[in-house]
């Protein structure tokens, strides 16, 4: 008897069963309310448990077979037509109310596919983080490479579980074509739809759409063509924790917290423009396919199994809470040494140093150096004067430029107006008459 009862309880509800659950008017007619639409969506045997909000893509998914042909999980216009037709069986045809009910039901059945994936992993105890870049790409098996990989993996995990968390580090793989650098990041993203290499411009108003639904974003083209100006834009972009974007059906823009991390690949050995304040956001790791144990695409199934355990190991570290998303002070020195290996020749610094060796005046400003040391005739952009300031200040602090210091107040320069700049520690007898000191009040007005 109990077996028969259990079978009845498990049997799908018919349309008539669901109709009995709906609120009706006094004449027995079904009320066309949002709540009745919700009841249908939650209990109709075709639609029940089908509609969920994907917290990664921030879109509504249909997550089970629903009886009509479809491709992909995301709810689309054709799906809506089928749902509207299904709702007509209950005498409800208000598209607006049905759409509202769908959003409510989806929101109450939200899920995060990457969190579900990571939480479902069980580590086998074999360490792979320290070896993965050597295994697939022939990178060095040293502490620096291990820490670089660990920071990147833990940053990716934290971005998923704590969207919008601060993580502005880019792991950059440097090596020849065909080494498998892009394939490594694609497989590291676990599913191809969680990976993207389609980010081409950072000033695109729809940049959020390029990030939406992805976990690992490869920026190969921008890294390959980076210059001093674009590297500043990339650094600023990496430091963002959210995008503000209005989804078409929404009335107001909303903050979209970042859930992705960014990776770089290049075969350029001088991909990092000279940055005197440090390129701490970029972690370069040289790779050599000839030294790798396997090519990542030789046996894709085996590579994916390896990567599953890589994430399982990283999750074990993440759950322990015993980690930092930055290098130790000692390892920072190693990072800076690696960055120096991939920096472009600092031609501007050399030109400025040479100019100062022959210069007889007692003061210089960035605009003067831009024109007289670098030979430019146009007005410098802000980033260009900032680069000159970095050359001077870093050169002075490192001892590369001796006998100069930044002057404390703004000075008036005959050709360049009131400027902050640098002065000789011991001024020569000539040149002082060409400048006049500006009071703090005037200086602040011109900064």
Where are the model-predicted features located?
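Feature primarily recognizes SF3-like P-loop helicase cores of small DNA viruses
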Residues: 89-112, 166, 193-199, 203-238, ...
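N-terminal nucleic-acid engagement/recognition segments and initiation subdomains in replication
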Residues: 1-128, 143, 147, 378-383, ...
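P-loop NTPase catalytic core of nucleic-acid-dependent motor ATPases
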Residues: 102-212, 367
């Amino acid at each position: 008897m109990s077996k028969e009862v259990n079978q009845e309880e498990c049997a799908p509800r018919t349309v008539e069963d669901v109709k009995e659950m709906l609120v009706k008017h006094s004449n027995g007619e079904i009320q066309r309310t949002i709540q009745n639409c919700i009841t249908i969506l939650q209990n109709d045997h075709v639609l029940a448990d089908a509609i969920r909000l994907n917290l990664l893509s921030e879109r509504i998914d249909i997550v089970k077979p629903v009886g009509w042909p479809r491709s992909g999980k995301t709810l689309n216009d054709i799906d809506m037509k089928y749902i509207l037709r299904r709702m007509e069986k209950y005498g409800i045809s208000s598209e607006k109310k049905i759409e509202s009910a769908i959003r409510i039901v989806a929101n109450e059945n939200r899920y995060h596919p990457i969190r579900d994936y990571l939480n479902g992993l069980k580590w086998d105890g074999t360490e792979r983080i320290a070896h993965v870049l050597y295994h697939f790409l022939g990178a060095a098996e040293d502490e620096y490479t291990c820490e670089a990989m660990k920071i990147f993996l833990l940053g990716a995990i934290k971005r998923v579980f704590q969207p919008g968390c601060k993580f502005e580090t880019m792991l950059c793989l440097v090596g020849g074509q065909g080494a498998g650098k892009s394939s490594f990041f694609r497989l590291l993203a676990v599913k191809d739809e969680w990976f993207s290499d389609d980010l081409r411009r950072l000033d695109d108003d729809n940049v959020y759409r390029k990030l939406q639904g992805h976990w690992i974003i490869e920026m190969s083209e921008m890294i390959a063509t980076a210059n001093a100006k674009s590297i500043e834009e990339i650094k600023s972009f990496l430091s963002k924790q959210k995008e503000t974007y209005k989804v078409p059906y929404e009335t107001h823009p909303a903050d979209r917290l970042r859930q992705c991390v960014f990776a770089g690949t290049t075969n350029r050995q001088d991909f990092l423009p000279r940055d005197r304040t440090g390129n701490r956001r970029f972690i370069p790791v040289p790779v050599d396919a000839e030294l790798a144990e396997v090519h990542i695409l030789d046996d894709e199934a085996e590579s994916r199994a390896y990567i599953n355990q890589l994430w399982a190991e990283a999750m074990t570290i993440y759950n322990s809470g015993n980690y930092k998303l930055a290098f130790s002070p000692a390892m920072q020195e190693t990072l800076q040494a690696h960055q120096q290996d991939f920096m472009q020749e600092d031609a501007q610094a050399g030109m400025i140093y040479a100019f100062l060796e022959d210069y007889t005046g007692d003061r210089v400003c960035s605009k003067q150096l831009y024109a007289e040391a670098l030979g430019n005739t146009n007005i410098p952009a802000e980033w260009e004067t900032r680069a000159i300031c970095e050359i001077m200040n870093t050169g002075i602090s490192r001892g590369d430029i001796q006998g100069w210091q930044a002057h404390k107040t703004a000075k008036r320069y005959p050709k360049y107006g009131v400027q902050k700049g640098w002065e000789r520690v011991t001024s020569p007898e000539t040149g002082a008459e060409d400048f006049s000191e500006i009071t703090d009040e005037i200086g602040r007005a011109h900064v």
